[in-house]
Structures are given as C-alpha cells and as structure tokens.
Amino acid sequence: MIEVRELVKNYGSKRVLDHISFDVNKGEILGLLGANGAGKTTTMNIMTGNLSSTGGTVRLNGHEILEEPLQAKKELGYLPENPPLYPDMTVKEYLKFAYRLKKCRLPYKEHIEDVCKAAYITDVYDRVIKNLSKGYRQRIGIAQALIGEPKILILDEPTSGLDPVQMLEIRNLITRLGKKHTVIFSS
C-alpha cells in the first residue's frame, strides 16, 4: 500500500532524512514518533507530494508520487499539522467546499453523511467552525481527509494542542479508521 525507499532530504548542507525506508500494508497504522525537528513532517510532506525529496521514492498503492502524482494523490487523504479550516464557514459549508475542491464524484449527500459519521461530527454539522473546540476542529480536518474514500490517510500531528480527553478521542478515531484505511500519523 505504502512503500518508502531510501528517502533522503537535504536543506542546503543539512541532511534531515537519511535513507529512510519502510512499508505500510493495507489496514495497518504506523505512528511516526520523534522530537521536534526529527523529520516527521518533512517525511509526510514528501509522501503527499507537497515537498520534493533529495533522493529516494514514495509509492502510494503502486503509484510513485513524483511520476504519477494525480493517481497517487487520488489514493490519499491528508490532514496537515495545521488543518486549513475556514473559521467563518459552517462545517457543512467547509465540507461542501472540500468535496468540490477534490472533484469528488461520490453521491454528495450520502458521502458527506458517511464522512461526518466516521469523524463523529454530525452533531456540529450546522455550526460555525470558529465556535468549536480544537478537538472538533481536528475531527473536521480528518473528515475532509476522508472525502473521496481514500485508501491511505496521512495525519500530521492530529493530537497537537488537544487536552487529554480530546487526545484519547482522536486516538480512538484513528484506531477505528485503521479498519478501513491504511493510516500514518505523527506525534
């Protein structure tokens, strides 16, 4: 499902990733753990095609991210470290925006209902995002990552800034998502 081979990233003369290789199979959950500056976000940005590597390859469901970026990204749902939410939108408006941006072809109403159920946000569907807790905002970010039924989810720091109860909720959500998706998260 995910193949990372000999991944290298240099920023000038500083090497931040040094020949990293790993596989994540269908239905597995992989956590990238490490101190700030360890290269977790850099690895995820390369895996999502948002940053080029100095060397090595990334394949998502058989598609090399640099050679076949459109096909690879169709397999992918991504939650960046700072979810790109629009605080003045309602959850409904934001998810509709994300659905259109991703050019999703699944039946809109049913698909968005499924995404909201999966991310446990149905109870805030009509609320304005800026009025919601950080935990809900993270779940909204996860919901947008689920749009289009991607096989692979990459979640960068999904529990960052959350209180212990919210952290547990997000970790439980990731565990449930791992039953249908291959998941990589950083912490």
Describe each PLM feature range.
Residues 153-157:
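Catalytic Walker B motif of ABC-type/P-loop ATPase nucleotide-binding domains
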Residues 147-151, 180:
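A short, proline-enriched helix->beta-strand linker immediately N-terminal to the Walker B motif
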Residues 142:
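Hydrophobic anchor residue at the start of the ABC signature
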Residues 96, 100-103, 107-124:
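Conserved ABC ATPase "signature" region
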Residues 167-179:
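Helical segment within the ABC ATPase nucleotide-binding domain
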Residues 56-67, 71-72:
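Conserved ABC transporter NBD signature motif
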